[in-house]
Design a protein with these regions (language model features):
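Alpha-helical membrane-targeting segments
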Residues: 1-31, 70, 113-123
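Short beta-strand segments
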Residues: 29-63
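Covalent nucleotidyltransferase core used to form phosphodiester bonds in nucleic acids
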Residues: 22, 57-62, 66-70
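Residues at structural and domain junctions
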Residues: 1-4, 28, 58, 90, ...
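Short, structured beta-strand-loop surface elements
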Residues: 64-132
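Short low-complexity stretches enriched in small and charged residues
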Residues: 2-18, 43-48, 81-88
Length: 132
């Protein structure tokens, strides 16, 4: 295991712990937990992700090389923990609309310029979650 992998694993574990604790307010305004089911194994995977919420829609942007979002292609049920609240929803993945990905990046990172968001969108995917 690489040093960066170990560091990321420890950091993710710490963030997961915080988001499940009464101290979630320290990070839960911008970070949530998403739980997805593996398409082939059925195993549950929980990952902390940055998000922005607009009503019943939660938007997440992930790097293309990450694997968790691939289980959501074609639409899939998910569980999320947002600001201390557990919700169920349905997620869809947007891979080919880089303009939509750039727009989502601007919502997640308001200090980005449009050019920076467009550059970063090239190796990102957009996940839209409709929560009930």
């Amino acid at each position: 295991m690489k040093v960066l992998d170990i560091t990321a694993s420890v950091a993710n574990g710490t963030v997961k712990f915080l988001l499940r604790s009464p101290l979630h307010g320290l990070v839960s305004s911008r970070v949530m937990l998403i739980t997805v089911s593996g398409r082939q194994t059925g195993r549950l995977y929980t990952t902390p992700v940055n998000y922005v919420r607009d009503g019943d829609t939660i938007t997440v942007v992930s790097r293309s090389h990450r694997t968790w979002w691939r289980n959501l292609r074609g639409g899939a049920p998910v569980a999320v923990r947002v600001r201390g609240e557990d919700l169920k929803g349905v997620a869809e993945v947007v891979v080919d609309d880089k303009e939509a990905v750039a727009k989502a990046l601007l919502a997640l990172h308001p200090r980005y310029s449009a050019e920076r968001a467009a550059r970063r969108a090239q190796d990102r995917v957009l996940v839209r979650i409709k929560v009930a």
